[in-house]
Amino acid sequence: MPGFRDLNQRLTALLADRVRKGEVTERGLSRLTGVSQPHIHNVLKGKRFLSTETADAILHEMHLDVLDLLDPRELLEWQQRR
């Protein structure tokens, strides 16, 4: 199972992809989370990491779940271990 750093990177990649596709803007993410737009920009460029609080806020506001960041094979592997 991936750790927080890996999940953080996956969330960042997902957000960067959505920004690239025009589904959301850096400013929009800033408004949703209360985090400054420059900080969001630096996160998307890999210069900063999201705090757990900010990651949770983004997941909540974008109607995502941490499970959305997992590969289906990872979920299956986790379920088989339980």
Where are these regions (language model features)?
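Residues that mark the N-terminal boundary/hinge immediately upstream of a DNA-recognition element
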Residues: T25, S51-T54, D65
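Short, basic-rich loop-to-helix N-cap that marks the start of a DNA-contacting helix
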Residues: K47-H60
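Short alpha-helical DNA-recognition segment
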Residues: K21-N42
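A short, Lys/Arg-rich alpha-helix, primarily the initiator
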Residues: M1-V24, G28
